[in-house]
């Protein structure tokens, strides 16, 4: 047991000698150029500790420090390079959590608000479209009555169109009949004119033939002389 303690102490001496140098390097690396208010730094450390009251947080911090001091003083825990690296990594992680977490939280909140706005806008548009569709469908609730009225109107329209077509056929037939009758009348008139012309030409031809006959001329001359003699006799 004593040999193990001596071995542990002998192995720990180089590490303990290296410890202050590593602590100085870590402190130099973690140092900030701008000074920070000790009160605000202490308040930030207390806020990062678990607990609901300042007394409980202070108790946790004091207990942790006392436990660490007791462990190191009794060589229950040896401070070596790994410890310095762990402390440095823990401090760096703590700083990252303190600096990056609020910015990421703000970005996440803005992103969630943007997505929520898009979803709410889409939902409102969908609700408006559904309401508009419902209103358009509700306007068609009397479609049966409207269809009946339109059917009656279309029926009356068909009847009127049938009557109009029938009257048009009658008018077309009457027009055609009138055209046929007019053509027949014109034909009869032309035939009558032709017959009258032929009769007149025949009579004129016969008269001219009689006038050209010497016997007829002598007879007419004798008749004329007799008429003149009768006229003179009546004058005496």
Curated annotation (Swiss-Prot):
Cystine crosslinks: none
Gene3D superfamilies: 1.20.5.2210
A cellular component term, taken from the record's GO annotations: mitochondrial inner membrane
Alphabetized InterPro entries for the sequence: ATP_synth_Bsub_B/MI25, ATP_synth_F0_suB
Superkingdom as given in the UniProt entry: Eukaryota
Molecular function terms, GO-annotated: proton-transporting ATP synthase activity, rotational mechanism; proton-transporting ATPase activity, rotational mechanism
GO BP terms, alphabetized: protein-containing complex assembly; proton motive force-driven ATP synthesis
Feature: transit peptide: 1-29
Cellular location(s): Mitochondrion; Mitochondrion inner membrane
Alphabetized UniProt keyword annotations: CF(0), Hydrogen ion transport, Ion transport, Membrane, Mitochondrion, Mitochondrion inner membrane, Transit peptide, Transport
Main location: mitochondrion
Function: Mitochondrial membrane ATP synthase (F(1)F(0) ATP synthase or Complex V) produces ATP from ADP in the presence of a proton gradient across the membrane which is generated by electron transport complexes of the respiratory chain. F-type ATPases consist of two structural domains, F(1) - containing the extramembraneous catalytic core, and F(0) - containing the membrane proton channel, linked together by a central stalk and a peripheral stalk. During catalysis, ATP synthesis in the catalytic domain of F(1) is coupled via a rotary mechanism of the central stalk subunits to proton translocation.
Subunit structure: F-type ATPases have 2 components, CF(1) - the catalytic core - and CF(0) - the membrane proton channel. In yeast, the dimeric form of ATP synthase consists of 17 polypeptides: alpha, beta, gamma, delta, epsilon, 4 (B), 5 (OSCP), 6 (A), 8, 9 (C), d, E (Tim11), f, g, h, i/j and k.
Family: Belongs to the eukaryotic ATPase subunit B family.
Protein name (database record): ATP synthase subunit 4, mitochondrial
Organism: Eremothecium gossypii (strain ATCC 10895 / CBS 109.51 / FGSC 9923 / NRRL Y-1056) (Yeast)
Taxonomic path: Eukaryota, Fungi, Dikarya, Ascomycota, Saccharomycotina
């Amino acid at each position: 047991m004593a040999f193990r303690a001596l071995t542990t102490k002998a192995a720990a001496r180089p590490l303990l000698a290296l410890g202050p140098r590593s602590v100085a390097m870590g402190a130099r690396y973690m140092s900030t150029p701008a000074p920070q208010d000790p009160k605000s730094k202490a308040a930030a450390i207390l806020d990062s500790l678990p607990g609901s009251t300042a007394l409980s947080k202070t108790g946790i911090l004091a207990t942790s420090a006392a436990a660490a001091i007791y462990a190191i003083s009794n060589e229950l825990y040896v401070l070596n390079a790994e410890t310095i690296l762990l402390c440095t990594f823990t401090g760096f992680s703590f700083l990252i959590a303190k600096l990056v977490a609020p910015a990421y939280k703000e970005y996440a909140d803005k992103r969630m608000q943007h997505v929520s706005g898009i979803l709410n806008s889409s939902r409102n548009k969908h609700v408006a479209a559904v309401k508009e569709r419902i209103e358009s469908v509700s306007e068609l609730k009397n479609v049966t009555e409207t269809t009946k009225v339109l059917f009656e109107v279309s029926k009356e329209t068909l009847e009127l169109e049938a009557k109009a077509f029938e009257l048009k056929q009658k008018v077309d037939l009457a027009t055609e009949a009138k055209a046929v009758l007019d053509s027949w009348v014109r034909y009869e008139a032309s035939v009558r004119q032709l017959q009258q012309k032929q009769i007149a030409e025949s009579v004129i031809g016969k008269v001219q033939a009689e006038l050209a006959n010497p016997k007829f001329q002598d007879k007419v001359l004798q008749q004329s002389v007799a008429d003149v003699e009768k006229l003179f006799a009546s004058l005496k």
